[in-house]
Amino acid sequence: MRTEYCGQLRLSHVGQQVTLCGWVNRRRDLGSLIFIDMRDREGIVQVFFDPDRADALKLASELRNEFCIQVTGTVRARDEKNINRDMATGEIEVLASSLTIINRADVLPLDSNHVNTEEARLKYRYLDLRRPEMAQRLKTRAKITSLVRRFMDDHGFLDIETPMLTKATPEGARDYLVPSRVHKGKFYALPQSPQLFKQLLMMSGFDRYYQIVKCFRDEDLRADRQPEFTQIDVETSFMTAPQVREVMEALVRHLWLEVKGVDLGDFPVMTFAEAERRYGSDKPDLRNPMELTDVADLLRSVEFAVFAGPANDPKGRVAALRVPGGASLTRKQIDEYGNFVKIYGAKGLAYIKVNERAKGLEGINSPVAKFLNAEIIEAILDRTAAQDGDMIFFGADNKKIVADAMGALRLKVGKDLGLTDESKWAPLWVIDFPMFEDDGEGGLTAMHHPFTSPKDMTAAELKAAPENAVANAYDMVINGYEVGGGSVRIHNGDMQQTVFGILGINEEEQREKFGFLLDALKYGTPPHAGLAFGLDRLTMLLTGTDNIRDVIAFPKTTAAACLMTEAPSFANPAALAELSIQVVKKAENN
C-alpha cells in the first residue's frame, strides 16, 4: 500500500512518485489549496492539494485530524523561503495526485493542541501512542533491545527463556498468584525475576545466559514502578564480580554511544559505606557537587543536646551539608526545607548562614550559634570549606535518619538552586553492601536476596557474626537512578543453608521452598554471578522522560489498573467454580 514512510522523505526523493499511508496530523484549508501534515511512525511530511487535481482537492476538503489516509503524489523541493528547518522533511513536500480515505475518525477524546490528563492518555493509549514523541520513545526502546541482543550475542551469551508459571519464593515483594485448574487448591506464581532459574542454568553448564524478560511484583507502586516490568537478565559462570562489571559496563557504554552519541567513560567504583557517608544515599547523583561532611567529633562537648546526643552515640551521626550560594535563601525557604526533612524522620534543620567569615561570629547568622563557641564554628567552617555566601545545613540523629533526610535534602536543594548539572551523565558502581539489614522485629533480612554470597567469609564466620557480613554485590547507578544490580551467588550448599538460617528459614521450610536448589548445589555447582538491568528505567533515561509509563506501550496506573481494558476485572463465577475458588467479601468495620 505504501512505497515510502512519510518521515523518511528527503531531497534525494525529489521528482519521484511515492505512495504514503498514515494519519492527518493537521489540515490547513486556503480555499484553492489545501495543505496537510501527514504522519506515520517515522515522522511528518507536508502534502498539498491544488486545483489541477480537482478530485483529490475535493476529497481533501473532508479531511480531519486522525483520518487514516493513503496519498500518491510527487516529491518536490520547497522554495527557500518555505523551508521548515524544524522538520526532518522540511526541505520537501508532496504534491498529491490521488487521495484515498481509508478510515474516518470520530471527534477525538484527546486534544493534540493541549496538555491531556494522564488518565485520558492511558484510557485512549492507542491515540496517545500516535503522538511523535511517544512513537519516538518506543522506537528508541526497540533500538535498545536490538543493541542489547547484538552485544550479548557478540559476547557469547545465550538467549534462554525461563518459565512464567513457577513457584512462589520470598524475594522481597508479594507474588501474583495463578490458580491451577488441574491441581485443585494449588497456585503458580508469576516470577518476580528469573533468579533461581538462571542460577540453575549455570549449574546446567550454560555459562553465559541472558534474557529480556517480563517480571511481576505485587507491591505498592511509585512513579518509577510498574506491577509488570522488563529486565535485561544476565548470569555468568567462572567470572569474578569485577569481570561481570566490566562486561556490563561495556554494554551500557555501548547503549549510550549508539543512542545518545555520548561516551560515558570509565565508571567510578564506590563502596556502599562511602556513598552513604558522602551523599546519604546508596544511589548517589554525582551531577550534584554537594557532599555531606561528618562533624560529630567537633560537637561532643557542646551543651546543646540536639548535637551532643547523636555526636556521643555510636549509632548517631551529625552531618553538615554546605550549599554554595545558599546564604541567599529566605527564611520561608529555610522553613520549607525544615518541613521537608521531617518527612524522612528528622526533627528539624539547624543551619549556619555564612555572610562574611572574616568577621567571625558577627559574620554568620544561625539560631544555634549561641550554643557553639567561635572555635567550634570556625572548625566547622574549615572542615566544610565554607565561603562567604554559603549556607550550612545540619542533620543530627541516628545514622539512618541523617542519611535519608540529608541525602534527600541534598537532591532537592541541588535541583532548586540549579547546582545539579542536568546536561551531564554521571554513572558509577556501588559495591560492598551490607549482607543483611534489621527487619525491625529483632531479626535480619537480606539486603539484596538470600542467594547473594558474602565477601571473604566462611559459613562458620558468617553464622558467628552475620551483622558484620559484606555482600559481594554491586549496583549500577546513573544520575541517581539504580539502573541495574547484581551479585556473586552462593554456590555452596552449606553456605546457602547458613544464610537461610540467619534469615529465620528453618530446615523444613528450606526443603519445602528451596529443596530443588539445595539438591542442585550438591552436584558440582560452578561459581557464578550475574546482574539484571531495568529495561524500562534505562529507556526512561535514554529518552529523557521522568515517567516510566512514557516508555511502556500499555502501562498500568499507580493503582495497578489498565484504564483502557479496565483490568483487573471480576472473574466469571463459572470459571472460579472450576478452579474451586470462592471470593469472600471482607467484613466492614462498623
UniProtKB/Swiss-Prot annotation:
Originating species: Escherichia coli O157:H7 (strain EC4115 / EHEC)
**Entry's Gene Ontology cellular component terms:** cytoplasm
What ranges does the record give for the region Aspartate, renumbered to this chain? 195-198
Q: Which HAMAP family match?
A: Asp_tRNA_synth_type1
Gene that encodes it: aspS
Alphabetized SUPFAM superfamilies for the sequence: Class II aaRS and biotin synthetases (SSF55681), GAD domain-like (SSF55261), Nucleic acid-binding proteins (SSF50249)
Q: What is its main location?
A: cytoplasm
Question: Under what name is this protein listed?
Answer: Aspartate--tRNA ligase
Q: What is one Gene Ontology biological process annotated in the Swiss-Prot or TrEMBL record?
A: aspartyl-tRNA aminoacylation
